[in-house]
């Protein structure tokens, strides 16, 4: 799959590199190694583009625009960092709940 690079310009510091795969998926690798996949979708009802984090299916809080370029310009380094942090928190909660269920299940079996 062919990837195209584009950069998000920061006011302070260097630009953030984001890869765009063929189609409408963007990939961003955070400094901690977390890979963020963002889907660009056009709403058929209103005819505007929106952004979605693919692994969770959550909409990214940006204003919908008729042009894809205007939606992508709203991706800032701060927003990407917040999305990565929220994604890590959601994953940690999910892992903790699975571990708790597993631990509770073993405890019940051992008591019998």
Model feature map: region roles:
Residues 79, 83, 87-91:
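Acidic, low-complexity intrinsically disordered segments
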Residues 22-25, 39-41, 92-99, 104-105:
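Non-catalytic tandem-repeat scaffold regions and their flanking low-complexity/translocation tails
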Residues 1-4, 103-112:
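Short intrinsically disordered terminal tails
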